[in-house]
């Protein structure tokens, strides 16, 4: 089964899609594709067949998203917690991943046609070496495509992602690339696996479970959360439309909350900068200075220096992460 299913919407689906596109269309949707095992039990087939049908549904859902103008999709494919399942099920899931990432390498023409960039987010060092290699090749093969993006969260949990981002910032301080005062929510956001993506507009979980299961906890603080009872392999175009309509009904409130949060984050950073400038002036014996121009000059210099350090650190971090892909490329050459 292909990663991208070709084909047009039906006449009725196109009619409804045009109505939906008259309102605010989400740029980025995240899916917790839950219900594969229950689907297998319901249909009296092997669990592995349930997971295979789940992948097939992903390919179909990506086609719907493309037709609706949704250009970024993130899916929860394999949690670190999944390693605790039975050996046979874990082995089956990893074998399915091997098969699908190998298949992806055979679909270069289709991926290029649609401009699909594949990103795999997670602690990939937890995976078998041969699967790491297949994933690295898939990322490398599509990294220059930029029409639409598929983020596959594999060997992932949000807590692990956040802890890793904190370790990266600590590494930056240890290396002298950052000052401890440079550490902030904004910088942590840029150290996440998902740092190249906007936060999801909608998070959809199927199967009726009403929990996030350690998925994108940081990124979905201002997302529309949609919990649907349908099992993932039975997901339909109409289920997707229902979720988008729910997002559209709440779009104004969500956007207002995002804007307020962004302003609050800027305000807190300005307060920290002003406190740092005051401390500098006190150390220099200028605490009584009422020179507003001096304070503005110091404030501008402080923020400029911080931005230079942060950008230097982020470039070093990007290079460090890219080295993993480069090593696999060298190994296979």
Curated annotation (Swiss-Prot):
Disruption phenotype: Embryonic lethality. Conditional deletion in retinal pigment epithelium causes deficits in the retinal pigment epithelium and the photoreceptors, leading to retinal degeneration. Conditional deletion in rod photoreceptor cells causes retinal degeneration. Binds 1 magnesium ion per subunit. Isopentenyl diphosphate binds at residues 38, 85, 205, 211, 213. GO terms for cellular component: dehydrodolichyl diphosphate synthase complex; endoplasmic reticulum membrane. (2E,6E)-farnesyl diphosphate binds at residues 34-35, 37-38, 85. GO terms for molecular function: ditrans,polycis-polyprenyl diphosphate synthase [(2E,6E)-farnesyl diphosphate specific] activity; metal ion binding. Mg(2+) binds at residue 34. It is a peripheral membrane protein. GO terms for biological process: dolichol biosynthetic process; dolichyl diphosphate biosynthetic process. PANTHER family: DEHYDRODOLICHYL DIPHOSPHATE SYNTHASE COMPLEX SUBUNIT DHDDS, DEHYDRODOLICHYL DIPHOSPHATE SYNTHASE FAMILY MEMBER. With NUS1, forms the dehydrodolichyl diphosphate synthase (DDS) complex, an essential component of the dolichol monophosphate (Dol-P) biosynthetic machinery. Both subunits contribute to enzymatic activity, i.e. condensation of multiple copies of isopentenyl pyrophosphate (IPP) to farnesyl pyrophosphate (FPP) to produce dehydrodolichyl diphosphate (Dedol-PP), a precursor of dolichol phosphate which is utilized as a sugar carrier in protein glycosylation in the endoplasmic reticulum (ER). Synthesizes long-chain polyprenols, mostly of C95 and C100 chain length. This is Dehydrodolichyl diphosphate synthase complex subunit Dhdds. It comes from Mus musculus. The lineage of its organism: Eukaryota, Metazoa, Chordata, Craniata, Vertebrata.
